[in-house]
Regions:
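Enzyme catalytic cores with a strong preference for nitrogen-chemistry domains
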Residues: 1-365, 376-377, 381-390, 422
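Short glycine/threonine-rich loop-to-helix capping motif typified by GTGT followed
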Residues: 366-379, 407-410, 438
Length: 466
């Protein structure tokens, strides 16, 4: 039996605000619950060994999504509940990890498409699918009833379990981690439940899905998941059905995704039925939401928070990739587009200022380095946009101790090729006089030495002096 006290004692703090999530697709056979359960348990064990805190499985993974009218048979429904109980008991062997699994569930004579959250030997809650597709290749309303928001309690294996869409799964050891659930089609609607989840505090959305493949749908799906994570400023874990489903009408590719605030952290290869893992930065999510003054929490919340026990909270070796140059795209075409955008933003800003002040002259200190070169290029484009003569751009080069032939020559050549005015002011004697005034040895190359040159470099002539 799970010993919470022992578990808490061996756990540390959430390492740097990250929590590990997995989107998993088990091998299944349609309507073979026993076979499916064994494969789900196997993946749960695999995820737990990798210190995963959140494991998400596909829609209807206990029975298979493509059971069609078999969903109306008691034998399959009872097998699904027995499978859920089996997973609940097995979760005692994966302490600290919450697993989300999909199954059909009958209540008051109605059949619901639900996802159950399971952890440490308990069924924490069950969330029904709100939007049932009944168009094209889908006809879920033939068997299922749309879910509802209100939280009610249902009996599962002698355990009172909260049931409803407005559930958030929270944890004892970190209140910043709040999980909301939506199911497949819910995300594709004009007003997904995840919007309300996030406005009521959810920092991570999990989606148990059975999304089929058509030409181009994978690209749209990825944009949808990534875009929703950006719009809601959240982590989004999306698990989809795979090759074990029936292909009578549709084909599934197990296109599993994990996104965070608009970035794709992990993506499965289609048709590989593979699991993907990622470390979600919950601290960053909370920080971004604090920064956004328009991100308001619903004050009239009717949500029920399901209190879970402590999740896996070790100091982990991050599996997340960090780009050494996060603001510089690696793709040349995208990089060129980004540079053009930067140049336009700065140039049009300067153009407005020049026109507003009726100024046709600009003075720029040119060192031959990156900063002054960019400033010159921006000014040149702004002058071109205004229709001004480039000779009104007065480039001043001020050589001193630190000036090399390379940077000096770069500054001179760049200015001449762009058709700007050039003036050279050697500040070496002025800097020496400054050092003499303050009693500093020019051979002592410390901060004072650097600042002495910098002070005079910022003393540029005005346009009228040029």
């Amino acid at each position: 039996m799970f010993d919470e006290k022992t578990y808490i004692e061996r756990e540390g703090k959430l390492k740097d605000g990250y929590i590990r999530a997995a989107a998993m697709t088990p091998k299944i056979k349609v309507a073979d619950c026993e076979y499916n359960i064994e494969n789900i348990k196997s993946l749960m064990s695999e995820a737990h060994k990798k210190d995963t805190a959140i494991a998400v499985f596909p829609e209807m993974c206990i029975t298979g999504y493509t059971c069609n009218d078999l969903f109306l048979h008691d034998r399959l429904l009872n097998a699904a509940i027995q499978g859920l109980v089996d997973i609940k008991k097995y979760s005692e062997t994966t302490p600290g990890m919450i697993s989300f699994v999909g199954l059909p569930y009958e209540m008051n004579g109605k059949l619901y498409n639900v996802v159950a959250g399971i952890m440490n030997g308990c069924i924490l809650g069950m969330v029904p699918k709100m939007y049932l597709p009944n168009y094209g290749e889908f006809y879920e309303r033939r068997q299922f009833t749309p879910g509802f928001n209100e939280c009610v309690y249902v009996d599962v294996d002698g355990e009172e379990v909260p049931f409803g869409s407005e559930l958030l799964f929270t944890f004892n050891n970190n209140r910043k981690v709040k999980i909301g659930v939506e199911i497949c089609e819910d995300l594709w609607t004009p007003q997904p439940p995840s919007i309300k989840h996030a406005m009521n505090g959810a920092t991570i959305i999990v989606n148990a899905s059975a999304s089929n493949e058509t030409i181009g749908k994978d690209t749209y799906r990825k944009q949808l998941v990534s875009g929703q994570s950006a719009r809601l400023v959240c982590g989004y874990v999306y698990s989809s059905a795979g090759g074990g489903e029936s292909t009578q009408d549709i084909v599934f590719s197990a296109h599993n995704l994990i996104c965070e605030n608009g970035s794709t952290l992990a993506e499965a290869h289609k048709f590989a039925d593979e699991s993907v893992y990622a470390d979600i930065d919950v601290e960053r999510i909370c920080s971004e939401r604090r920064r956004m003054s328009t991100y308001a929490v619903d004050e009239n919340s009717t949500y029920t928070e399901v209190q879970a026990q402590n999740f896996i909270n070790k100091e982990l070796e991050l599996i997340r990739y960090f780009d050494k140059a996060p603001f510089v795209p690696s793709d040349k075409k995208e990089r060129d587009s980004r540079c053009e955008e930067i140049l336009n933003i700065q140039s049009y800003g300067l153009k407005k200022r020049l026109e507003h002040t009726n100024c046709k002259n600009a003075v720029i200190g040119i060192s031959g380095g990156l900063d002054s070169t960019l400033a010159l290029l921006v000014t040149v484009r702004a002058f071109d946009l205004c229709g001004f003569d480039r000779s009104g751009i007065h480039c001043i080069t001020m050589p001193c101790f630190g000036t090399t032939d390379r940077t000096y020559n770069n500054a001179v050549k760049l200015t001449k090729q762009l058709g700007c005015s050039l003036r050279e002011i050697n500040i070496m004697n002025a800097v020496r006089q400054h050092f003499e005034d303050i009693g500093h040895d020019e051979n002592n190359h410390n901060v004072t030495y650097e600042n002495g040159q910098a002070c005079l470099l910022y003393t540029s002539p005005s346009p009228r002096d040029c």
